[in-house]
Amino acid sequence: VSFSTFEDSRMGEWDDYYDQATQRNIGLVTREEQSRLRQARIAIAGMGGGGGLALTTLVRMGVGNFHIADFDTFSIANTNRQAGAMSSTIGQPKVEVMAAMARDIQPAVQLTSFSTVIGMHNIDAFLDGVDVAVDSLDIFAQPARRLLYARARAKGIPVVFSAPPGFSATIGVCVPEGMSFEAYFDLRDDMTPFQIMAAFIVGLTPAG
């Protein structure tokens, strides 16, 4: 049964499922805010440690629409920290595994998957109609990361980022009207890839 058939023929059942699945959110959020979450569309770049947990957490919170991107497959080395990495998913595409996991949590969640590297060929589609973007890209994916922030800023989309330095965590938000990603991390086009990565790491822990 395709998703569209499920949605068309069982919408009443889906509404009841959604209400029951999110009823314990009320108090943390209002019913009006829960309705907004259901209509929201979030783009998550990277389905590894951070992105996988972001997706499953947001699905459980009741967010109804996602764009997810990752070109990689799960490996044994991922099992210590990535939500979708299990013995049964080794070698499988991360976007496919995480999409299936999301639909198992909320059967009618809307997902659009991008299984190639984020680049000029797909960045506008990835951000199309999105309310918020989440940067969970690999530390080495700086060209894709810079493109993500630049296009999101141009489209008026906030980008949330987080990182786990040591046994702590950092979180930041780049809003369109605030300091740009390039300015905050002091990135310049004449920097080498290593210099860009080093500046990014330092910027994640400015007090460290």
Where are these regions (language model features)?
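N-terminal charged helix/coil linker that caps or initiates catalytic domains
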Residues: 1-43
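Glycine-rich phosphate-binding loop and adjoining beta1-alpha1-beta2 segment
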Residues: 5-10, 65-106
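Conserved N-terminal Rossmann-fold NAD(P)-binding element of oxidoreductases
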Residues: 44-46, 69
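Hydrophobic/small residue at the entry helix of a nucleotide-binding pocket
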Residues: 50-51
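Aromatic pocket-lining residues of Rossmann-like dinucleotide-binding sites
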Residues: 58
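A structured beta-alpha segment of the ubiquitous adenosine-cofactor-binding alpha/beta core
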Residues: 95-132, 136-145
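E1/E1-like adenylate-forming module used to activate ubiquitin-like modifiers
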Residues: 129-208
